[in-house]
């Protein structure tokens, strides 16, 4: 069964719960209504039909503080990226069959809902073993899987959650477990997290409802207290940082029967919470015309459940893309890197494509230059250019990179060395030197760092993304890890 996007949107609530902040569907000021109408008219006049519903346009407007030209540019850049990446059909044509093996090395999963009805998303950065992961997958396929998850989140999880509570649910509750994070583990996954964050910020804005960083290393809060001054206050109010004493705080937001046992809850699964994908999106009474959510790691059917309102909707090319995925993954498993790159050309550009500014051009990427027949048959989507959206002309926002200058990285590295010495001294029974504590001079340096330390020069407040706003920021702060933990709750 297939339905149009319009029929799909009509199948679940399109207004938020009453009494919340303005700027959301069903709760707009007169000025916000006018801005929404203005943006919608511009896009419809230009021939756009899909994703011009109120909820979608309002997310882009909120991300750009209701500046219509900036929101328009951000939205149009997103549409270009979607076309180039093949996002509209990714649920039907991408097969991440190495999912189970990757999950053992980098746990990322959804599990039930919080007390406000949001899907709960969990990620364990400290458990990452990037070297082992890249024996069975590639960064490009990991990013494609990330987009697959985003699309399943939007098309299946959020609608089901909205039907449960009777009003629109647009965001997630994220738990980022930093247990085990160290300088080496953070730097291993930094490249992936940076590209993942860029995708979330630029193409899935305003998807973060609550964000919990748990098992935060000592020293993390000190740096974050500086960083947060440069972030949008609305975003900061959603972020909560805790050390090892987080259980009570998590249980205040997530019911015990929904929170995994490892975090102090009561929820478990026979196949493991990392793979179960339990939630309303698996309950037939809350599943609408979109059908049951696809299962990550299973071969896609190739049949879309939701089609475009317009006649220009990109048709599914499942047979071609799934075949290319098979060859790429099999070749990777056999250690044949060249064959994997060639066979995977139909789904991801190799090498540093993630660092290219893909959203800045509607041109397709050049075909792979390899001789293998697979590469010649499967065009390389400009899709894999996942990094950053271009800065809007005239007014302002630079690409969102969230990187740190050498001075801060040096301080963090020195800090970690102190922690190692402290641990060594404690083991030997001697007097432990002060670990993971910034000196007054270092704190002064942190406080004097310019705004681009936190934002990479972005003059607009950074938008929320569903995984996290500025994951690279978190990853770099986490480089101060290795010592005792401390609790620090960011005030609302």
Swiss-Prot record:
Gene3D superfamilies: CRAL-TRIO lipid binding domain, N-terminal domain of phosphatidylinositol transfer protein sec14p
Domain CRAL-TRIO: 98-271
Gene Ontology annotations for the cellular component aspect, listed alphabetically: Golgi membrane
Region spans: Disordered: 274-310, 377-403, 454-492
Domain of life per record: Eukaryota
Stored Pfam families: CRAL_TRIO, CRAL_TRIO_N
Recorded topology in the membrane: Peripheral membrane protein
Coiled-coil ranges from the UniProt annotation: none
InterPro entries the UniProt entry points to: CRAL-TRIO_dom, CRAL-TRIO_dom_sf, CRAL/TRIO_N_dom, CRAL/TRIO_N_dom_sf, PI/PC_transfer
Keyword Membrane: yes
Any one of the GO BP annotations: post-Golgi vesicle-mediated transport
GO molecular function, one term: phosphatidylinositol transfer activity
Compartments reported by the entry: Golgi apparatus membrane
Keywords of this entry: Golgi apparatus, Membrane, Protein transport, Transport
Low complexity bias: start-end ranges: 377-398
Free-text function comment from the UniProt entry: Required for transport of secretory proteins from the Golgi complex. Catalyzes the transfer of phosphatidylinositol and phosphatidylcholine between membranes in vitro.
Protein's name in the database: SEC14 cytosolic factor
Species of origin: Yarrowia lipolytica (strain CLIB 122 / E 150) (Yeast)
